[in-house]
A protein has these predicted regions:
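A short loop-to-beta-strand structural motif that recurs across blades of beta-propeller domains
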Residues: 24-26, 70-72, 117-119, 160-162, ...
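A short beta-strand motif characteristic of beta-propeller blades
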Residues: 34-41, 80-85, 127-133, 170-177, ...
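Short, solvent-exposed loop/turn segments at conserved positions within beta-propeller repeat blades
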Residues: 18-22, 64-69, 110-116, 154-158, ...
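Blade-level signature of beta-propeller repeat domains, shared across WD40, Kelch, NHL, RCC1
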Residues: 270-306
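Repeated scaffold domains used in trafficking and secretory/extracellular systems
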Residues: 1-6, 44-52, 87-97, 134-145, ...
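Residue position within the beta-strands of beta-propeller blades
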Residues: 14-15, 60-61, 104-105, 153, ...
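Short loop/turn segments that connect beta-strands within beta-propeller blades
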Residues: 29-33, 75-79, 122-126, 165-169, ...
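Conserved core beta-strand positions within WD40 beta-propeller blades
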Residues: 11, 57-58, 101, 150, ...
């Protein structure tokens, strides 16, 4: 996905060339009227935003996911590249609070006997400062937790969920339901806990890594072999959306009473986290619209240019 939403600083970063025909990486600040260009040089026309530091001052960009491409660290205020990290394959990288460290899972395929160790590097030197030596296949997600300056990431085999702490540089396994194969993990926008999703079950955990509640869609819905695959959040902590893969549906849950509604996505090619109690939807022609999770009202969206 070429769009990343920064809930803490109420910003959205996107590759405008992909959607609107203009080169560069852009930022929509929702406390200001217009979007501004962070990197406008044509040299960066193929670069995507990969991670955002929680302090809002640093972003990481690169050309391709899952390759040995350099990772560029960018100062958002100065709108310039401040450092380049070479010789690492960053898959779903995650920055710490200050943008001084980068965590990433690595390529792995248990069926081909390919294993990689999740690692953390110093953003200034590019030196590896922590690794997890565990032979398993890693999931395609990382979820930064601002409260603890940590990142959650999943594995295909038990333990299913791990946490890396940027301050102590330590890894730990998180106790989860062993019957659930985790597909996605997201930190709640109010930073009071996090969600994980797998086996058509959505689980909410508090900051002490204890389960608070769950919704079992296997029991509530006849999904006919289809899989709830990913979680998408807005800045409203009471609403969570989960995506039914191959089904073109969103299940939108109200966590106050655990009721939920369904929304037909139709021929959409993607969606993204967004602000103002909404998700951002992308159609086959790369037009953007917002979907209000409470009212299910959909409106066209085009960030105003500076």
């Amino acid at each position: 996905m070429s769009i990343i939403t920064d809930f803490t600083n109420r910003r959205m970063y996107f590759w405008r060339g992909y959607y609107f025909g203009k080169e560069g990486i852009w930022c929509q600040d929702f406390d200001k009227e217009k979007a501004f260009c962070v990197l406008k040089d044509s040299l960066y026309k193929d670069y995507l935003v990969r991670a955002v530091a929680d302090n809002g001052k640093t972003i990481a960009v690169s050309r391709n996911i899952g390759t040995n491409e350099p990772l560029l660290m960018v100062d958002v205020d100065k709108r310039t590249v401040i450092n380049t990290i070479f010789n690492h394959t960053f898959i779903y990288p995650c920055l710490d609070r200050e943008g001084s460290k980068v965590f990433s899972v690595t390529k792995s395929d248990i069926y081909k006997n390919i294993y990689g160790n999740p690692f953390c590097v110093d953003a200034q030197t590019g030196k590896v400062i922590a690794t997890l030596d565990e032979k398993t296949q890693w999931g395609n997600n990382t979820a930064y937790h601002p409260e603890s300056n940590s990142v959650y990431f999943s594995a295909f085999r038990q333990p299913n969920l791990y946490k890396f702490n940027f301050d102590t540089l330590t890894f730990s396994a998180v106790p989860t339901d062993k019957k659930i194969r985790i597909f996605d993990c997201k930190v709640a926008c109010d930073n009071k806990g996090y969600y994980y999703l797998g086996s058509n079950i959505l689980v909410y955990m508090n900051n002490e890594d204890k389960e608070v509640w769950r919704i079992n869609f296997k029991e509530k819905e006849k999904l006919n072999g289809k899989t709830l695959f990913s979680i998408c959040l807005s800045d409203h902590p009471d609403y969570i959306a989960v995506y039914l893969i191959d089904g073109e549906w969103l299940f939108i849950i109200n966590r106050n009473d655990f009721s939920y509604k369904k929304y037909k996505l139709g021929r959409r090619v993607g969606f993204s986290e967004f602000l103002n109690n909404s998700l951002l939807l992308i159609d086959k022609n790369y037009n953007l619209s917002t979907l209000n999770l409470e009212t299910l009202e959909e409106k066209p969206f085009l960030p105003p240019l500076a």
